[in-house]
Amino acid sequence: MAVDVYRGTSGIQLPVEVSAEIWQKIQDASVVMGLARRVPLSGAGVTYQEILEDPTPQFVGETDRKPVSNPTFAKKTLKGHKIAVVSTYSDEFRRDLPGLFNALVSRLPGALARTFDMAALHGVGAPAADFDDLSGATTASILNTTAGSVDAYAGFLAALGAVPTLNAWALSAQGEVAALSNRDVNGGAILNPNVLTNGSIGSILGRPVFRSGNAYLAGDAAAATLGIAGDWSKAVWGQVEGVSIDISDNPVYDADGDLITAGWQDNMIAVRAEIHVGFIADDSQFVRLLGAEPAQVA
């Protein structure tokens, strides 16, 4: 049967072990991995205890009975979940055409990172259990109703008011445009490009701004997500081992069990790449920044 990648496509032979280089590129491409707190993660997962409320002491008089007040707790389980993809190639493609290795290193990390970010930030494709996402975080509008106005500035202030410990903004290109095309109440720029730290593109209200297309999620009218902001110390991620890369000439099937290629019999190979990652967060410490869909160019 016809397959997607052969000598007429483009590429190069792939060494089996490219995990370290690919993993570094995944982290570089993921805004969540860059901002959230990274912790060690075993295959069995890790349970974190969270103190929700401290005991409440009171003044008491002489001989009066002391009040009883206990802390309240919650727990979250950080567990590794698999993100995987299988691509098929002809033996002739692998043998004759250079570039597959470079293409894998340059493109696969971004694809894996985007899958993780979209799940963590927006709940897109997220596992049903033991994996948090920020889709339910409170919202603030940075809708740019009038260019050069303070519309968006009010939204950024509202986000900071909702999460006073907010320590970073993750903005899509659309969110960056909203910030750049508005002003604060003194007529100054909202996005200050002069404060550049750790890969940020500037600062808003003294907090660093990081650009990522993964922070964008399409929505209706003025309800597109243009960015995510919050206290990123309240978000935790971990990885189990590194990136697993395998090459096989075994048959490959789709999700319905239908044969895609017979592998060795068809002179085809399959490249499987997977990572195991987990994410937990307190979504009450984050704000989704909403605005208009970008205008379509005719």
Spans of model-derived segments:
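Extended oligomerization regions of viral-like shell subunits
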Residues: 42, 133, 141-262, 267-269, ...
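Structured loops at beta-to-helix junctions and adjacent beta-edge loops in soluble globular domains
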Residues: 49-52, 90, 172-174, 212, ...
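Short, Φ-rich (hydrophobic/aromatic) sequence segments
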Residues: 18-32, 100-108, 112, 116, ...
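Assembly/oligomerization interface modules of large self-assembling protein complexes
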Residues: 2-83, 283-286
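Short helix/loop capping segments that flank catalytic or ligand/cofactor-binding pockets
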Residues: 56-59, 97-98, 178-181, 188, ...
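Short loop/turn segments at secondary-structure transitions that flank enzyme active sites
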Residues: 54-57, 84, 93, 114, ...
